[in-house]
Design a protein with these regions (language model features):
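Single conserved hydrophobic/aromatic residue that forms the stacking wall/gate
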Residues: 1-11
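Intrinsic disorder/low-complexity detector
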Residues: 7, 24-25, 48, 52-111, ...
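Generic short beta-strand segments
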Residues: 13-19, 107-111
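A cross-kingdom feature marking solvent-exposed beta-strand/loop segments within repeated
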Residues: 18-38, 43-44, 52-56, 118-126, ...
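Short amphipathic, charge-patterned alpha-helical segments
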Residues: 42-50, 136-141
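Surface-exposed interaction/gating patches
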Residues: 87-137, 141-143
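A generic hydrophobic-segment detector
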Residues: 126-127, 131-167
Length: 179
């Protein structure tokens, strides 16, 4: 598990019409997290991802600035190294009918103030790819141990996130795959 930290924008609710396995025209939605420093970069990536998806109508795109402090990388992600606007895509190969995906894990850290001796708490959210919510908890514990986290913490909430991919710079990807 490695951390992806940076400025992220979220391309939420990219909606278009496509065909299902039976050939019927159906609405399709997808969400992607992209490392972008500004709205213009995210918009450029969104339009690149939408290219060719307008066969049955317009593509609706909503871009939301999302501050994501950490995404823990692991081999649950499949990787597409073909660059899209200079970014590598991490995605999930499993169908949407499974629990495989990105999970938001909310943590509360407990710190002891050295001057007063009182315990202070701070909140954090880490996104982690996993096959299930219980595996997300295991992955977070492993990630924090490898990161050298020494503070006590409590996992408060584990929530499935609808993002279907995470797009990162080649440099971030190289840092993630180093053993």
């Amino acid at each position: 598990l490695r951390s992806l930290v940076g400025s992220e924008m979220c391309i939420r609710d990219r909606a278009y019409k496509g065909t299902n396995d039976l050939g019927a025209i159906v609405p399709i939605k997808s969400e992607d997290l992209v490392m972008a420093t500004c709205y213009t970069e995210a918009e450029q990536i969104a339009y690149k991802l939408a290219k060719g998806k307008d066969e049955f109508g317009d593509v609706d795109i909503e871009i939301v600035r999302t501050k994501i402090s950490e995404v823990a990388y692991n081999d649950t992600f499949a990787t597409d190294t073909e660059l899209i606007c200079g970014l590598i895509s991490y995605f999930f190969e499993e169908s949407e009918d499974t629990e495989v995906g990105l999970y938001q894990v909310s943590l509360v850290y407990y710190d002891v103030d050295e001057k007063t001796g009182k315990t202070k708490s701070s909140n954090s959210t880490i996104y982690v790819p996993a096959y299930s919510s219980s595996e997300a908890i295991e992955n977070i514990r492993t990630y924090l141990k490898r990161a050298g986290e020494t503070r006590e913490y409590t996992i408060r909430n584990v929530k499935y996130d609808k993002a279907q991919s995470v797009m990162v710079t080649p440099e971030t990807h190289q840092n993630n795959i180093r053993v």
